[in-house]
UniProtKB/Swiss-Prot annotation:
It comes from Ralstonia nicotianae (strain ATCC BAA-1114 / GMI1000). Signal peptide: none annotated. SMART domains: BHL (SM00411). This protein is one of the two subunits of integration host factor, a specific DNA-binding protein that functions in genetic recombination as well as in transcriptional and translational control. GO terms for biological process: DNA recombination; positive regulation of metabolic process; regulation of DNA-templated transcription; regulation of translation. Belongs to the bacterial histone-like protein family. It holds the Pfam family Bac_DNA_binding. This is Integration host factor subunit alpha. Heterodimer of an alpha and a beta chain. GO terms for molecular function: DNA binding; structural constituent of chromatin.
Length: 104
């Protein structure tokens, strides 16, 4: 399955919007910088029709070293989660091609 990169997003802006390549790259970088800065400040980011980036605090918990079996603490941390909007989920579900039946 192919992956869309920031460079490819900039190229698409160049082709579809008519910005020059430098402006396209700068716009993509600025977009992600704004999202990154909002999350760093503890804000959620809601993109209508796309989804929400939210912060979630995970408490400290016990973990286990798989080699020694020793119990070690996993420190508390903050993680970023993404929840796709219903609209995005519906669009993705529409495009799913059924798996071919196995020849058994």
């Amino acid at each position: 399955m192919p992956t869309l990169t920031k460079a490819e997003l900039a190229e698409m802006l160049f082709e579809q919007v008519g910005l020059n390549k430098r402006e396209s790259k700068d716009m993509v970088e600025a977009f992600f910088d704004v999202i990154r800065e909002a999350l760093e400040q503890g804000d959620s980011v809601k993109l209508s029709g796309f989804g929400n980036f939210q912060l979630r605090d995970k408490p400290q918990r016990p973990g286990r070293n798989p080699k020694t079996g020793e119990i070690i603490p996993i420190t508390a941390r903050r993680v970023v989660t993404f929840h796709a909007s219903q609209k995005l989920k519906a669009l993705v579900e529409e495009r799913v091609e059924p798996m071919p039946a196995s020849a058994a």
